[in-house]
């Protein structure tokens, strides 16, 4: 805070000649007027005004007495501190890192729980438990189904424009909710009323039928792709999942999203509605009807997490080297294998 103080300094003229021009110069005599306080002035003075700016600091100084050099050094210290503080550039507060912190905490919790479960029992027992629970089947099917899927490219396109952690959180929230809903629908097949119950495992047969249907359909669609579809996913964007994802993102995200909540909501809504009725959802329903709901839900969510993470980190890179035809054939074969395994009770 700077305070301007005007100080008037009167500089007298050295001499004044007589009017007739003769004789030595007359000395000026001061006349003092007393009006409450003494105010002296000299006649025929020319006032010269100067503005003196005094720099003050808004530092609170406690009461105390200073003598001699202590007072001077204290004043110099305050002046130098104020100067240094005023010369330092002010930095705006950094943005919050809550989404990254939440993702890191969830990842650490998952790793800690996996570590405890794995080392508490024998590794072979853990693997057998995962296989029997449906975790392995759900993870493999969902992971292969999501690679090159519409939701895969939606997450990749959004991650190119916005913060990756926010896109991952929004996408995984949608996929986790969709997985839970699918498992609940699958368990409804097991809750048949008593008057309709028979000795036939209707839920398992429905799951086998769904898995076989998607297996044959995936192989048929991949086989009908043109020969130039062997190149990569991005090269076939005119008629593939990438073209649909690009059109959907351009239509729904017309303006730039600035708020983190907007990015979370847009990622959630786009992925949720794109996943509704998709083959991965129906595959989760089929597995949920035939196997353990907890194993299927955890395996499906883990498969979604790995596939979505790959899409966000290197979706554009993977699209250059993955063949749409090859991905479709592998997915169809896996669907058929799990249908056969479910029929013979392997899982």
Swiss-Prot record:
<keyword id="KW-0472">Membrane</keyword>
<feature type="transmembrane region" description="Helical">
    <location>
        <begin position="124"/>
        <end position="144"/>
    </location>
</feature>
<keyword id="KW-1133">Transmembrane helix</keyword>
<dbReference type="GO" id="GO:0032468">
    <property type="term" value="P:Golgi calcium ion homeostasis"/>
</dbReference>
<feature type="transit peptide" description="Chloroplast">
    <location>
        <begin position="1"/>
        <end position="12"/>
    </location>
</feature>
<feature type="transmembrane region" description="Helical">
    <location>
        <begin position="299"/>
        <end position="319"/>
    </location>
</feature>
<comment type="similarity">
    <text>Belongs to the GDT1 family.</text>
</comment>
<keyword id="KW-0809">Transit peptide</keyword>
<feature type="transmembrane region" description="Helical">
    <location>
        <begin position="327"/>
        <end position="347"/>
    </location>
</feature>
<dbReference type="GO" id="GO:0071421">
    <property type="term" value="P:manganese ion transmembrane transport"/>
</dbReference>
<feature type="region of interest" description="Disordered">
    <location>
        <begin position="70"/>
        <end position="97"/>
    </location>
</feature>
<feature type="transmembrane region" description="Helical">
    <location>
        <begin position="165"/>
        <end position="185"/>
    </location>
</feature>
<dbReference type="GO" id="GO:0015085">
    <property type="term" value="F:calcium ion transmembrane transporter activity"/>
</dbReference>
<feature type="transmembrane region" description="Helical">
    <location>
        <begin position="196"/>
        <end position="216"/>
    </location>
</feature>
<dbReference type="GO" id="GO:0009507">
    <property type="term" value="C:chloroplast"/>
</dbReference>
<keyword id="KW-0934">Plastid</keyword>
<dbReference type="Pfam" id="PF01169">
    <property type="entry name" value="GDT1"/>
</dbReference>
<dbReference type="InterPro" id="IPR049555">
    <property type="entry name" value="GDT1-like_CS"/>
</dbReference>
<feature type="transmembrane region" description="Helical">
    <location>
        <begin position="99"/>
        <end position="119"/>
    </location>
</feature>
<dbReference type="GO" id="GO:0070588">
    <property type="term" value="P:calcium ion transmembrane transport"/>
</dbReference>
<dbReference type="GO" id="GO:0005384">
    <property type="term" value="F:manganese ion transmembrane transporter activity"/>
</dbReference>
<dbReference type="GO" id="GO:0031969">
    <property type="term" value="C:chloroplast membrane"/>
</dbReference>
<keyword id="KW-0812">Transmembrane</keyword>
<dbReference type="InterPro" id="IPR001727">
    <property type="entry name" value="GDT1-like"/>
</dbReference>
<keyword id="KW-0150">Chloroplast</keyword>
<protein>
    <recommendedName>
        <fullName>GDT1-like protein 2, chloroplastic</fullName>
    </recommendedName>
</protein>
<dbReference type="GO" id="GO:0019722">
    <property type="term" value="P:calcium-mediated signaling"/>
</dbReference>
<dbReference type="GO" id="GO:0005794">
    <property type="term" value="C:Golgi apparatus"/>
</dbReference>
<feature type="transmembrane region" description="Helical">
    <location>
        <begin position="257"/>
        <end position="277"/>
    </location>
</feature>
<dbReference type="GO" id="GO:0032472">
    <property type="term" value="P:Golgi calcium ion transport"/>
</dbReference>
């Amino acid at each position: 805070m700077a305070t301007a103080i005007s100080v008037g300094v009167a500089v007298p003229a050295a001499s004044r000649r007589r009017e007739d021009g003769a004789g030595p110069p007359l000395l000026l005599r001061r006349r003092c007027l007393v009006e409450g306080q003494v105010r002296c002035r000299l006649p025929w003075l020319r006032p010269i005004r100067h503005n003196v700016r005094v720099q003050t600091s808004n530092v609170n100084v406690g009461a105390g007495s200073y003598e001699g050099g202590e007072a001077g050094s204290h004043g110099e210290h305050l002046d130098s501190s104020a100067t240094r503080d005023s010369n330092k550039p002010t930095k705006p507060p950094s943005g919050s890192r809550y989404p990254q912190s939440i993702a890191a905490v969830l990842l650490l919790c998952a790793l800690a729980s996996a570590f405890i479960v794995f080392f508490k029992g024998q590794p072979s027992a853990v693997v057998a438990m995962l296989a029997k629970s449906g975790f392995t089947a759900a993870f493999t099917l969902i992971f292969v189904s999501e690679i090159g899927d519409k939701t895969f490219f939606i997450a990749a396109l959004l991650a190119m424009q916005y913060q990756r952690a926010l896109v991952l959180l929004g996408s995984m929230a949608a996929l986790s909710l969709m997985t839970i809903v699918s498992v609940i629908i699958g368990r409804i097949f097991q809750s048949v009323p008593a008057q309709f119950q028979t000795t036939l495992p209707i839920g398992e047969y429905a799951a086998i039928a769904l898995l076989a249907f998607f297996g044959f359909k995936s192989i048929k669609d991949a086989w009908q792709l043109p020969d130039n579809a062997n190149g990569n996913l991005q090269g076939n964007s005119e008629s593939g999942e990438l073209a649909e994802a690009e059109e959907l993102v351009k239509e729904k995200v017309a303006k730039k999203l600035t708020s983190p909540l907007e990015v979370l909501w847009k990622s959630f809504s786009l992925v949720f509605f794109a996943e509704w009725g998709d083959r991965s959802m129906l595959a989760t329903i089929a597995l949920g009807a035939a196997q353990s709901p907890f194993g299927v839900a955890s395996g499906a969510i883990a498969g979604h997490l790995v596939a979505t993470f790959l899409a966000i980190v290197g979706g554009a890179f993977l699209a250059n080297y993955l063949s749409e035809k090859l991905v479709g054939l592998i997915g169809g074969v896996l669907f058929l294998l799990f249908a056969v395994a479910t029929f013979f009770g392997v899982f």
